[in-house]
A protein has these predicted regions:
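N-terminal subdomain of nucleotide-sugar transferases
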Residues: 1-55, 60, 231, 236, ...
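Carbohydrate-associated surface elements
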Residues: 41, 167, 186-187
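Membrane-proximal helix-turn-helix segments that form the acceptor-binding/catalytic region
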Residues: 84, 104-107, 111-115, 141-163
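Acidic anion/phosphate-binding donor-loop and adjacent secondary structure
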Residues: 173, 187-204, 225, 392-395
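Conserved donor-binding/catalytic core segment of Leloir-type glycosyltransferases
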Residues: 207-234, 366
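Nucleotide-sugar-dependent
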Residues: 224, 277-284, 289-313, 320-329
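Nucleotide-activated donor-binding/catalytic signature segment of Leloir-type glycosyltransferases, i.e.
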Residues: 241, 249-250, 256-283
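A short, well-ordered alpha-helix in the C-terminal region of glycosyltransferases
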Residues: 347, 354, 361-375
Length: 405
């Protein structure tokens, strides 16, 4: 069976960012499927490479988190058309697996179905256009109406939908009753990431020896709301909480603004680290005690399935989230961290002080995080669930029952 897998932001294991599509595509290849991955890169030329059995087509579409709204839209549209033209030339494809965001990836899949007769599965990582609409990024009511109509058509025409969180699945099921919808969250790589003792050499390298380290890693944009972490670090410095150190790892179009705020407050307890590879990130997480998962206070963002959270679980870190929703519920139910109101730095510091004062409680929470990763989100477990979707002899409703039991 030949599958066209479309993901604009495909990353291999050695690159920074989410490796979800790499792992899923690799699993398909290992189970006898032929996979043609269509993605993009920032080079000027088309490149085709075979990576662990996956034939990866890199289209020359520039994209960076620093891009503004119009720049991103141009990149989305360019990739949509280039991906369609390439996919339409691939022979003997049986199925398209399209992973959003952006929503335009779904339009590529829809065109393949309508013009080439290739059915598609649609993976929904974020609710788009609901997210940019709630955040006020898309304001024109006619454009919003057009995008929501396109979203609904993509859902209706998909043979199957894969949602990355319960909230996303509920949203889609309400609008598409009877449509097969699978919940397949992001993956905790419990093989690459492990719960480790702090390495003194790494603590010295990052100048955090003897500190309780709280780390944010990932994109730095409007949706990530890192102003909240700046205010926490500011309050900690004002209150002479010298035990605390903060690290921000990543890049994005609000990085300069966040750095300017840190400079304005003369924060000595916070450092910025550029975007890292997986191996470099593992070093930073070795010296980290708690990971901060941050989103702006919009309801749609409560449905997110942030890759950073699952990496934090795998490394056995105290998980702190400033967003309500299924992640906060998971953290609280499994006693591996806490929710902290982003508008109340005092609340954050009070909750952290409990773990500062009780190392055994910290160790237990970190152990619970690793256990949650192993029992609910491990690569082996979720890949097996993913592969069940492609068991053609099993009707989709039967697969759904199997996944929920």
């Amino acid at each position: 069976m030949k599958i066209i897998y479309i993901h604009q932001y495909f990353k291999t294991f050695t690159e920074g960012g989410s490796s979800r599509s790499y792992y899923l595509a690799k699993a398909l290849v290992a189970n006898g499927f032929e996979v043609e991955m269509i993605t993009s890169h920032n080079s000027r030329d088309y490149v085709c490479a075979v990576i662990d059995g996956i034939r990866v087509h890199y289209l020359p579409v520039y994209y960076d988190n620093q891009l503004g709204f119009l720049g991103r839209i141009r990149a989305f549209i360019a990739f949509m058309w280039q991906a369609y033209r390439l996919a339409a030339r691939l022979k003997n494809a049986n199925l398209c697996y399209a992973s959003s965001t952006p929503l335009t990836v779904g339009i590529t899949a829809l065109l393949l179905k309508k013009i080439k007769g290739i059915p598609y599965y649609f993976e929904v990582r974020d609710l788009w256009p609901l997210a940019p609409a709630q955040l006020g990024i898309i304001r024109n009511r006619w454009l919003k109406k057009l995008l929501f109509r396109a979203e609904q058509t993509i859902y209706q025409e998909a043979a199957t939908i894969v949602a990355l969180s319960p909230g996303i699945a509920s949203y889609i099921r309400e609008r598409n009753p009877g449509k097969p919808v699978y919940i397949l969250p992001n993956i905790s790589d419990c093989v690459f990431f492990r719960k480790e003792h702090k390495n003194p050499q790494l603590a010295h390298k990052y100048q955090v020896g003897g500190k309780f380290v709280i780390t944010y890693f990932g994109a730095i944009g409007k949706v990530n709301y890192l102003q909240s972490l700046i205010e926490i670090a500011r309050k900690a410095q004002q209150d002479h909480c010298h035990e605390l150190a903060f690290m921000v790892v990543g890049r994005g179009n609000e990085l300069r603004q966040i750095q300017a705020a840190a400079h304005k407050y003369n924060l000595k307890n916070l450092q910025f680290i550029p975007h890292l590879s997986k191996y470099q990130l593992r070093e930073v997480l070795n010296v980290t005690d708690a990971v901060y998962v941050s989103f702006a206070p919009y309801p749609v963002l409560e449905t997110s399935s942030p890759n950073k959270f699952f990496d934090a679980l795998a490394t056995g870190k105290l998980c702190i989230t400033n967003t309500r929703g299924w992640i906060a519920e998971l953290v609280q139910e499994n006693e591996c961290g806490f929710y902290a109101d982003p508008q109340k730095p005092d609340d954050f510091l009070a909750k952290v002080s409990y773990y500062l004062a009780d190392p055994e409680a910290l160790e237990q929470a970190q152990y619970n995080a690793r256990q949650l990763a192993e029992t609910s989100f491990s690569r082996h477990l979720l890949i097996n669930r993913f592969l069940k979707i492609f068991e053609t002899k099993v009707p989709a409703p039967a697969i759904m029952t199997a996944l929920h039991n």
